[in-house]
Amino acid sequence: MLNGCQSSKKTVTTATASPAMKNEKAERDASDLKQCQKNLNVLSRLHTTTYPSLKKNFDNLMLGASQYAGVRFQVNGQSQETIDALYRYRVSYLCSEIQQAALEVLVTRAELPK
């Protein structure tokens, strides 16, 4: 028998998160976004020079995400995964910038004059 000539069919399984895990992740994402908004508010209250540009970037990103949410289910699953990942990355990156800016301002203002 020629075993080498037979096509081997492999079953591919994909891992899917349970509804409870998805809900937990959504809650964590919402909490992270609220903290990001709080950090942005800190920059506003401290009258920093970085606030206007970070606020503009945040607002534009949220507007884009909102618009995408309105059409998300009209695109195929692979495109959804790609764009979802892109928005998660962009939000995470921007929120990291906001957090860093807030920490830098707070540390600078807490340092003793030399």
Feature names for model-found ranges:
Residues 6-9:
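Bacterial signal peptide processing site
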Residues 20-27, 31, 38-114:
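Surface-exposed, polar/charged faces of alpha-helical domains
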Residues 11-19:
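Sec-dependent signal peptide cleavage junction
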Residues 2-4:
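C-terminal motif of bacterial Sec signal peptides marking the signal peptidase cleavage site
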